[in-house]
Amino acid sequence: MSVEIESIEHELEESIASLRQAGVRITPQRQAILRYLISSHTHPTADEIYQALSPDFPNISVATIYNNLRVFKDIGIVKELTYGDSSSRFDFNTHNHYHIICEQCGKIVDFQYPQLNEIERLAQHMTDFDVTHHRMEIYGVCKECQDK
């Protein structure tokens, strides 16, 4: 088994444990949605998840996808990303990281910048806000779109 597959399986097991701890029933559809999110590096929309899973789950609906994503979000194993357009994207990586977004094709890529980890503490100190989280986005044109 490759390291990536082992990592996906480990993340899936941890997510299932979180769902069980919250009293959520584990269904094959939930597992498939989670597995897709964990293995996806594209921050998919609910429609993209639906299109990827519907061949294996012909009775699954977009509403089922949305309902499960809401459950995952409420438990804290998925983040919903909204960007002014009408479709939310979903990110399994809930650790502090940032996004660079292609202005032409909408591709979203994660990147780390550890120096920003202190920004919440600094903002809280300077403003007396109770900071809950932060989000940073950088926009540009990806290599694939530049080459077109």
Curated annotation (Swiss-Prot):
The UniProt induction remark is:
Autoregulated. Induced by low levels of hypochlorous acid via superoxide dismutase inactivation.
Which one of the record's GO molecular function terms can you name? DNA-binding transcription factor activity
From which domain of life does this come?
Answer: Bacteria
Q: Name one GO cellular component term.
A: cytoplasm
Family annotation (CDD domains): Fur_like
Q: Which InterPro entries match?
A: FUR (IPR002481), Fur_C (IPR043135), WH-like_DNA-bd_sf (IPR036388), WH_DNA-bd_sf (IPR036390)
- Residue span of region DNA-binding: 1-84
Q: Name one GO biological process term.
A: negative regulation of DNA-templated transcription
The UniProt entry, under Gene3D superfamilies, shows: 3.30.1490.190, Winged helix-like DNA-binding domain superfamily/Winged helix DNA-binding domain
- Tell me which residues bind Zn(2+): C102, C105, C142, C145
Keywords, alphabetical: Cytoplasm, DNA-binding, Manganese, Metal-binding, Repressor, Transcription, Transcription regulation, Zinc
Where does this protein reside within or beyond the cell? Cytoplasm
Chain's role: Manganese-dependent repressor that controls a regulon of oxidative stress resistance and iron-storage proteins. Regulates expression of genes encoding antioxidant proteins, such as katA, ahpCF, bcp and trxB. Also regulates expression of the iron-storage protein ftn, the ferritin-like protein mrgA, the ferric uptake regulator fur, the manganese transporter operon mntABC, and its own expression. May act as a hydrogen peroxide and organic hydroperoxide sensor. Required for full virulence in a murine skin abscess model of infection.
Family in the record: Belongs to the Fur family.
Q: What name does the UniProt record give this protein?
A: Peroxide-responsive repressor PerR
Q: What is the lineage of its organism?
A: Bacteria, Bacillati, Bacillota, Bacilli, Bacillales
